Design a protein with these regions (language model features):
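Compositionally biased terminal segments of proteins
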Residues: 1-209
Length: 209
């Protein structure tokens, strides 16, 4: 099924980095995204998953959660009409997903960097409780901003609603008086000075420089 799904979420964050960095935040589950138009299609995917050994994790209370060989896997549709929830950037992110080579003969699809950040910003806005210090979504955002050298050029190249959303989200962050602390708490000791670099790049981005 690897070619039919896009891997998303915190489990993929290390795939976006190109500089030496500290440990990545441990994550308890793997999130995969599937493009579906109806619940009937989701039911068919469920049957396919069960045939491959996936078991519904009813105890978790999460309707899209499965387990296989002890690994927790959340299987999420792009549309919010199927399970009642979704991220607004899932559909365009799925459409523009990129290939990532894990091994020579194994390739998976992941979000492009700009859509990864958009989904994380959207998730933080919805469930971050307005505190970047304790948000795993915000931690992932900082990790990519700190460890991907081309990220700001990639963000500047975005257009339309995506660009507007990114600019608006970063503007809101810059207007928060705790932004320096929020970023600092997710940086390694040796990287503490980079909080100023990240904030500076954020400001240049929203100002269109």
């Amino acid at each position: 099924m690897a070619g039919q799904v896009v891997y998303v979420g915190g489990a993929t964050v290390s795939l976006y980095t190109d500089r030496l960095s500290g440990e990545v935040r441990p994550t308890d589950d793997v999130d995969i995204l599937i493009e579906l138009l109806s619940y009937k299609g989701y039911a068919a995917i469920e049957e396919k998953l069960r045939s491959k050994g996936f078991v519904n994790d009813w105890e978790s209370g999460v309707i899209c959660r499965y387990k296989i060989h002890g690994v927790v896997v959340d299987v999420m549709p792009t549309s919010d009409q199927i399970l009642g929830f979704a991220n607004r950037w899932y559909t365009p992110g799925f459409a523009s997903a990129i290939d990532y080579v894990i091994e020579e003969d194994y390739i998976v699809k992941i979000f492009s960097p700009e859509y990864f950040l958009a989904t994380k910003l959207e998730a933080f806005n919805n469930r971050g409780k307005r505190d970047g210090r304790t948000s795993t979504d915000f931690e992932d955002i900082v990790y990519v901003l700190n460890n991907r050298s081309a990220i700001w050029d990639e963000l500047k190249a975005t257009r339309g609603p995506l660009k507007d959303f990114l600019v608006g989200s970063f503007t809101n962050l810059l207007n928060n008086k705790y932004i320096d602390e929020w970023i600092s708490v997710h940086l390694e000791y040796a990287d503490q000075e980079r909080q100023y670099f990240i904030v500076g790049c954020m400001r240049e981005f929203v100002e269109g420089k």
